[in-house]
UniProtKB/Swiss-Prot annotation:
Cofactor(s) of this protein: heme; Cu cation
E.C. numbers: 7.1.1.9
Mitochondrial intermembrane side, ranges: 41-50, 118-140, 213-227, 287-298, 358-370, 434-446
Group of enzyme by EC: translocase
Binding positions (heme a3): 376
Chain residues that bind O2: 244
Organism this protein belongs to: Tetraodon nigroviridis
Cellular location(s): Mitochondrion inner membrane
Assembly with partners or alone: Component of the cytochrome c oxidase (complex IV, CIV), a multisubunit enzyme composed of 14 subunits. The complex is composed of a catalytic core of 3 subunits MT-CO1, MT-CO2 and MT-CO3, encoded in the mitochondrial DNA, and 11 supernumerary subunits COX4I, COX5A, COX5B, COX6A, COX6B, COX6C, COX7A, COX7B, COX7C, COX8 and NDUFA4, which are encoded in the nuclear genome.
Physiological role: Component of the cytochrome c oxidase, the last enzyme in the mitochondrial electron transport chain which drives oxidative phosphorylation. The respiratory chain contains 3 multisubunit complexes succinate dehydrogenase (complex II, CII), ubiquinol-cytochrome c oxidoreductase (cytochrome b-c1 complex, complex III, CIII) and cytochrome c oxidase (complex IV, CIV), that cooperate to transfer electrons derived from NADH and succinate to molecular oxygen, creating an electrochemical gradient over the inner membrane that drives transmembrane transport and the ATP synthase.
Binding residues annotated for Fe(II)-heme a, in chain numbering: 61, 378
Residues binding Na(+): 40, 45, 441
GO biological process entries: electron transport coupled proton transport; mitochondrial electron transport, cytochrome c to oxygen; response to cadmium ion; response to methylmercury
Name of the protein this chain belongs to: Cytochrome c oxidase subunit 1
Source species taxonomy: Eukaryota, Metazoa, Chordata, Craniata, Vertebrata
Length: 515
């Protein structure tokens, strides 16, 4: 029974649970890798060995956190669980394809881990730039295995995207227009469109890299008329939409959490929120070369990419101020998800401001590949995406399980995590401004102080992760069942009960259009 239920599942709730468990497991692997990085950098001098093994760890940390933690949890976990409930659909549009989307991930993860275990590992960074990723600098199967891993993860995401787009457009009640669906549904829809348009470009780029390595083509080799810069354009045309894919579902979840715990029936400026997400999705495709300011582009090209990048701050600002406006005049309940949401708004804004700094091409030439960039994207990911995931998990855990988490423990956990991530990443701004480069396992001892502080912060974050596991165990051990849920009229996912039955909406939801 268990085998057929979990291996052959076509139920969106079960598949969502599989995604959440897989993502949590991968998140712990990614956390372990990050602690190896911070251990190496905690003092000058070598700890683990040479820069190759260090860069293999950095590369694996990035891939694990992006493709096996954030995306499976946000899109696969929360998306699968909540989207059908929020639009009144009995399941996803293609339930068996949904199952395949999940089961492509463990083999993909296995290939990624295998790439670290053969030869010298793939020490290329998550960008996998040639010629470093070519068959001279990386002889052996490591990079090839990484490419195959990315192929599988990419196919998984493309299939998932097709599924979500079809479900959201096609399976809501006829009386409901797209502009009456919850913001999280919009966020997943826009994310799915971004995935569908960007991943094939990555697939093309890494497939050409694969043939350059194995079939003697020269797509990225100047000796045969190729150009390594072409790879960078292909990669970043995927890579920049990807970072918006990582944060957009978080935007949707934060909108729900802020409205719920402010006691509001809807977020402030619903239409503005939707259009802002659409604008971010569109603009995300036309700014990719801001990752390449140092490759020698024309000044007019640099001017365009600087300006276009800064424009993204406008719809992002619309969202931030709409969240603050949602809080205004509400009866605010200071429960843990609200703490995560407020932390998200503040820290994501800090990360966004350093992003505005880096958008200036002249400044970026100086700051490129320093720890300033690392600090920037970890503020929007480690404190944006992760805070959104944590807030959403604490908020919707009673829906998924029927049990409540211990509110005091979750608040302590938030406090520890907040201190840990800020202590880890805030000093990295100082290191970057002082010129410490990324992707090196050692540094001059002038940089010792802030690296040590950063590494201490990472240990505090680790203790928060361990505390979270305890909180999860405590909830299932104590079995405090959900008594009642407030505001279900405007939060439709709660209306079928906690937890909802295995099959919901077996007959279509009836919606009376308001005249």
């Amino acid at each position: 029974m268990a085998i057929t239920r979990w291996f052959f599942s076509t139920n969106h709730k079960d598949i969502g649970t599989l995604y959440l468990v897989f993502g949590a497991w991968a998140g712990m692997v990614g956390t372990a890798l990050s602690l190896l990085i911070r251990a190496e950098l905690s003092q000058p001098g070598a700890l683990l060995g040479d820069d190759q093994i260090y860069n293999v760890i950095v590369t694996a940390h990035a891939f694990v956190m992006i493709f096996f933690m954030v995306m499976p949890i946000m899109i696969g976990g929360f998306g699968n669980w909540l989207v059908p409930l929020m639009i009144g659909a009995p399941d996803m549009a293609f339930p068996r394809m949904n199952n395949m989307s999940f089961w492509l991930l463990p083999p993909s993860f296995l290939l990624l881990l295998a790439s670290s275990g053969v030869e010298a590992g793939a020490g290329t960074g998550w960008t996998v730039y040639p010629p470093l990723a070519g068959n001279l600098a990386h002889a052996g199967a490591s990079v090839d295995l990484t490419i195959f891993s990315l192929h599988l993860a990419g196919v998984s995401s493309i299939l998932g995207a097709i599924n979500f787009i079809t479900t959201i457009i096609n399976m809501k009640p006829p009386a409901i227009s797209q502009y009456q669906t919850p913001l999280f549904v919009w966020a997943v829809l826009i994310t799915a469109v971004l995935l569908l348009l960007s991943l094939p470009v990555l697939a093309a780029g890494i497939t050409m890299l694969l043939t350059d390595r194995n079939l003697n083509t020269t797509f990225f080799d100047p000796a045969g008329g190729g150009d390594p810069i072409l790879y960078q354009h292909l990669f970043w045309f995927f890579g920049h939409p990807e970072v918006y894919i990582l944060i957009l579902p978080g935007f949707g979840m934060i909108s729900h959490i802020v409205a719920y715990y402010a006691g509001k029936k809807e977020p402030f400026g619903y239409m503005g929120m939707v259009w802002a997400m659409m604008a971010i999705g569109l603009l995300g495709f036309i700014v990719w070369a801001h990752h390449m300011f140092t490759v020698g582009m024309d000044v007019d090209t640099r001017a365009y990419f600087t300006s276009a990048t800064m424009i993204i701050a406008i719809p992002t600002g619309v969202k931030v101020f709409s969240w603050l406006a949602t809080l205004h005049g509400g009866s605010i309940k200071w429960e843990t998800p609200m703490l995560w949401a407020l932390g998200f708004i503040f820290l994501f804004t800090v990360g966004g401001l350093t992003g505005i700094v880096l958008a200036n091409s002249s400044l970026d030439v100086v700051l490129h590949d320093t720890y300033y960039v690392v600090a920037h994207f970890h503020y929007v990911l480690s404190m944006g995406a992760v805070f959104a995931i944590m807030g959403a998990f604490v908020h919707w855990f009673p829906l998924f399980s029927g049990y409540t988490l211990h509110s005091t423990w979750t608040k302590i956990h938030f406090g520890v995590m907040f201190v840990g991530v800020n202590l880890t990443f805030f000093p990295q701004h100082f290191l970057g401004l002082a010129g410490m480069p990324r992707r090196y396992s050692d540094y001059p001892d002038a940089y010792t102080l802030w690296n040590t502080v950063s590494s201490i912060g990472s240990l505090i974050s680790l203790s928060a992760v361990i505390m979270f596991l305890f909180i999860l165990w405590e909830a299932f051990a104590a079995k405090r069942e959900v008594e009642s849920v407030e505001l279900t009229t405007t939060n439709v996912e709660w209306r079928c009960g906690c937890p909802p039955p295995y099959h919901t909406f077996e007959e279509p939801a009836f919606v009376q259009a308001q005249t």
